[in-house]
Amino acid sequence: MQGGTPEAVKLGRWSRDFYLGQRAEIGTDSGFTRQGYLLPCFSEAEVAAAHDRIAMQQAEGIPVRWAGPDEVSELNPTMAPGVTLGASYCAEDGYITPPRNVAAYTAALLGTGVHVAERTAFTGLDGTDVRTSRGTISAGLVILTGGPKLAAVGALAGIRIPAGGARHQVAVTEVHPAFADTPMVFHLPAGLYWRPEEGGLLFGMSNPDEPPGEDRSVDEPYLAQMRARLAKLVPLTADLRLRRVWAATIDFTPDHLPIIGPALDRDRVFVASAGGAGMMWGPAVARATADVALTGASEITDVSMLGLDRFDESGRSRLAADPIALPFPEKTT
């Protein structure tokens, strides 16, 4: 819930509440683990920015607070003592299990009679008729999604969408009992985060110099660089083997904010993008887009500023970028 703007905070809070009540609502859950979330600071400028964010987040009703260096060590004993100047902390935050999340949604869709068309390519739109590799689907309303492929999806529909994708790497260490009850941590300046996973520690990283693209090979030199950085912060990891390492394509928008709203100059066609925060904002972005498509507005937050009309012809946004984001490329292509 520790977003960098009021809109991001509201999207994050709604998504967290959805995860908490997901089983009661749709009969499946995404394995949400409420274990807290730390954003450590390493400079006085970061401390000042954190206090400003905390004030904004508290005004939005989020139970976030400042934790000094000693308390950070208490909250996460695996971190090197005295390595930070403190951190923003919210005990109500947590994380989900991505594979379980996908399985949960799929089961819920199938259980309500939705036909999931796998291995079916989208090829374009005729009004709200959806052309696919298996024929045309007549629809009264269309919502375009696609994650890192969203710009390509938009191009097939004749719609310019400033969204991109870049390589993101994740690794999981071997098991160590010290990680079991530790909160998730996001080292914002380094684009490095970590949390417990299957008895070990999962850590993910995005290279700020990574160009947009679909490279899903593991960048071994950058992985080594991030492992060295992680070892300074979490010394236990220095001697732990890696059980799994993979790379994937993560989506992003130029201002690190979601896209929610109608396609420009199209009737009954809408666009939804979580802007690189799919697990944190995904449920709220989906609901808000559905709300806008059906009623013109959403009770989650005012999304009128999050539409495609905030971007100019070059894809530049008139909004300030959300400061709580991975270091995505400056341009989408």
Regions found by a protein language model. Give the residues of each.
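Helical element adjacent to the flavin cofactor pocket in flavoenzyme catalytic cores
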Residues: V83, S88-L141
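Dinucleotide-binding Rossmann-like beta1-alpha1 core, especially the glycine-rich loop
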Residues: M1-L75, G191-L192, P211, R229-A231
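Short beta-strand to alpha-helix junction loop
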Residues: K10, C41-A49, Y89-A107, S217-A224, ...
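Short Gly/Ser/Thr- and Asp/Glu-enriched loop/turn motifs at secondary-structure junctions
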Residues: T33-Y37, A166-R167, V245
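Short loop/edge segments at beta-strand edges and connector loops
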Residues: G68-P69, E118-T120, R244
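C-terminal catalytic lobe of FAD-dependent flavoproteins
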Residues: A231-T333
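Active-site lid/adjacent beta-loop-alpha segment flanking the redox-cofactor pocket in flavoenzymes
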Residues: V175-R268
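Central helical "cap/lid" subdomain
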Residues: T136-D181
